[in-house]
Regions:
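Short, intrinsically disordered N-terminal pre-domain segments
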Residues: 1-20, 486
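Extracellular repetitive beta-rich solenoid segments
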Residues: 24-57
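Acidic glycine-/aspartate-rich tracts in secreted/extracellular proteins
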Residues: 44-49, 140-142, 177-178, 246, ...
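N-terminal module-boundary/linker segments of secreted carbohydrate-active enzymes
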Residues: 57-163
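Short aromatic-cysteine micro-motif
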Residues: 124, 128-131, 156-348
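A short, polar/charged loop-to-alpha-helix boundary motif
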Residues: 362-376
Length: 486
């Protein structure tokens, strides 16, 4: 985005309307000047509201942060921190749909429907001709506190006590990414809202035996980890697959917004008596049987990328609208499925899985699989069981059993690594390679998240899959892309 207040346009100087709009939005929240004295400055009072005063603002967990707390191995989640922030969701509300070109945001889309006119009356093209379509995620900080018997997950605009992890501002593709083929024959990623009758963009695994209208306008799948990286590199060094911290940041925002780890909780648009969000994003595209999905379109993505624009979801979340699969069932009848949307991000979970860029997983023993982050400049293909300690950072242990997640490993940061599993579901499903407790397969693996159209109640943003090696690929796996803005 151009951050200059004054810019050159057609040889003339003019004010940058995007900066003015951002300033105007911020000024709406300033307190009035009643009772203000000379020398007063803007502070945050004990209630977490902006006010004029002489005292310097000192951010604390009570006035400048909000989050959730739960007893370890239990589901008794409560909201903590600034209650006003829980009602107003200041960080979540800064996620905005936008059209961007490389690292510059060209304009923000209409928050009530991306295909609707902008403030200047322009109806934005969403087909990529004016730039890619994505969701801008703001800079913020997050941390996990271990009190001994409880965990606390916090987010804030401040690194309050020096223990918070900074989340850099970034743009995420508004759904798993598409690709397009250049004149030189190379395939590159791009993010747009494409209708299923657009013959220019064939998605999925591009299987010629599948009816084209069931692949057109869909995310790209059928490629392995290295090929996904290649398609990003073909576009430029400014765009990559989503990394683990970026993914966990969006998870945290959703978990705190609904005070629940169950993304699939039923949609409930009513607020609680305290004015808080409740429920979840609904089941998502998770109700397809594998064999029927295979017959329908070869396990390729179900929902076209234009769907959220068509349904005027804008910067909002799941609204209850369905997607209809014609002639899906064996008797020729149709099937309805309900895409999960979080803050404009289509299929935040469900439909197809997403690859994560920088994570390496290797079996440790019968009880755990070790989870690592690649060090800067290290490629996934360079990792072996012998050099993993030198080329990676250890960040936690994944439970070596297939079951629902009951607790996470937060020892090394705000990463939602499933450390304990069982039938008392807290969050989604943990899926490993092979049978429970296997300790002979030491292959280097990649991380998948979210679950697919066949995963039912196991799906969700926390559905953690470590069963793929780097060379694996499938029609049911794609990936989000992100652009780091600093």
């Amino acid at each position: 985005m151009n951050f200059n207040l004054v810019e050159m346009y057609n040889g003339l100087l003019r004010f940058n309307k995007h900066i003015l709009n951002e300033l105007a939005e911020g000024l709406k929240h300033l307190p009035n000047l009643d009772g203000v004295s000379k020398g007063d400055s803007l502070i945050i009072n004990e209630q977490g509201n902006p006010a004029w005063g002489s005292a310097a603002f000192i951010p604390t967990f009570e006035n400048a942060a909000y989050g959730i707390e739960w007893t370890k191995d239990d589901n008794d989640i409560i909201r903590i921190g600034n209650a006003k922030f829980h009602r107003e969701l200041p960080i979540q509300n800064r996620l905005k749909g936008c059209v961007y070109n490389e690292k510059k945001i060209s304009y923000f889309l209409n928050p009530t429907g991306w295909a609707k006119p902008l403030e200047n009356g322009l109806i934005p093209p969403l087909d990529g001709s004016d730039g890619d379509v994505g969701v801008r995620v703001p800079e913020f900080y997050m941390c996990v506190k271990d009190t001994g018997t409880k965990y606390q997950l916090w987010i804030s605009d401040f690194n309050i006590d020096g223990t918070f992890t900074r989340v850099h501002p970034f743009i995420i593709s508004h759904t798993k990414t598409m690709t397009r083929t250049r004149e030189d024959g190379k395939e590159e990623v791009f993010s747009a809202c494409i209708k299923p009758d657009d013959t220019r963009y064939l998605g999925g695994n591009k299987n010629s035996s599948v009816v084209a209208t069931k692949l057109q306008g869909r995310p790209r799948t059928g490629i392995n980890y290295d090929k996904a990286n290649e398609f990003c590199a073909n576009r430029g060094d400014w765009i990559t697959m989503i990394d683990y911290l970026e993914y966990c940041a969006i998870q945290a925002l959703c978990y705190i917004e609904y005070a629940s780890f169950d993304n699939q909780a039923a949609l409930n648009t009513n607020l609680t008596s305290e004015g808080f969000k409740q429920g979840g994003l609904g089941a998502g595209v998770t109700n397809l049987a594998w064999d029927r999905w295979t017959a329908f379109n070869g396990n390729n993505p179900i929902v076209q990328t234009y769907w959220t624009a068509e349904h005027n979801i804008g910067n909002g979340s799941t609204n209850g609208d369905h997607y209809e699969l014609g002639n899906y069932n064996t008797d020729g009848s149709n099937l309805n499925t309900y895409p999960a949307v979080y803050r404009g991000i289509l299929n935040f979970f469900g439909d197809i899985w997403t690859l994560i860029r920088d994570v390496v997983i290797v079996n440790r023993n019968a009880n755990y699989n070790s989870v690592y982050l690649l060090k800067k400049g290290v490629n996934h293909a360079d990792i072996t069981i012998d050099n993993i300690q030198d080329k990676c950072y250890f960040i936690g242990d994944q439970a070596n059993s297939n079951n629902f997640i009951t607790e996470f490993d937060f020892r090394f940061g705000p990463y939602f690594i499933p450390n304990k599993v069982g039938s008392n579901k807290k969050a989604d499903y943990n899926w490993i390679r092979g049978s429970n407790g296997q300790d002979t397969d030491k292959a280097v693996r990649v991380l998948l998240f979210g679950g697919g159209a066949y995963d039912g109640s196991g799906a969700g943003s926390g559905h953690f899959g470590s069963y793929w090696v780097q060379s694996a690929f499938g029609a049911h796996v794609g990936f989000f892309t992100t652009v780091k803005l600093d």
